[in-house]
C-alpha cells in the first residue's frame, strides 16, 4: 500500500516509512509494526523529513493531537 511522507511528500510503500499513531485516548506514539489502529502519519527514515515535519507542526496537525516532547526527542535522535 502506498503512503505519503508528511515531511517531504514522497510517496512510497508503507514499509519504507516510520508510522506515528494517535489512539482513541489521544496517546501519540511510534507504531513500528502497525498493530495498533488509529489516526496515523508516515515519515521517511531520515532526519531532514523529521525536522521538516516538526518545524511546520505537520504531525500535530495531521494527528489532531499534541505531540509529547519525549517523542520529538526520540525521533530526532533516532535518525
Model-found features: residue ranges?
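Cys/His-coordinated zinc-binding microdomains
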Residues: 9, 45-50
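Residues immediately within or flanking Cys/His clusters that coordinate Zn2+
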Residues: 2-5, 41, 46
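Catalytic cores of RNA-modifying enzymes
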Residues: 1, 6-9, 77
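Short functional micro-motifs and their immediate structural scaffolds
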Residues: 13-16, 49, 54
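Short recognition patches in nucleic-acid-associated and regulatory proteins
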Residues: 13-31
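Conserved catalytic network of the ASCE P-loop NTPase/AAA+ motor domain
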Residues: 34-36
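C-terminal structural segments of small proteins and small subunits
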Residues: 51-79
Amino acid at each position: 500500500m502506498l503512503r505519503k511522507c508528511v515531511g517531504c511528500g514522497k510517496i512510497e510503500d508503507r514499509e519504507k516509512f516510520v508510522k506515528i499513531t494517535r489512539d482513541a485516548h489521544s496517546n501519540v506514539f511510534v507504531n513500528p509494526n502497525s498493530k495498533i489502529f488509529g489516526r496515523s502519519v508516515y515519515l521517511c527514515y531520515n532526519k531532514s523529513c523529521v525536522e521538516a515535519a516538526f518545524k511546520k507542526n505537520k504531525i500535530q496537525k495531521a494527528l489532531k493531537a499534541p505531540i509529547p516532547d519525549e517523542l520529538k526527542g526520540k525521533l530526532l535522535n533516532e535518525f
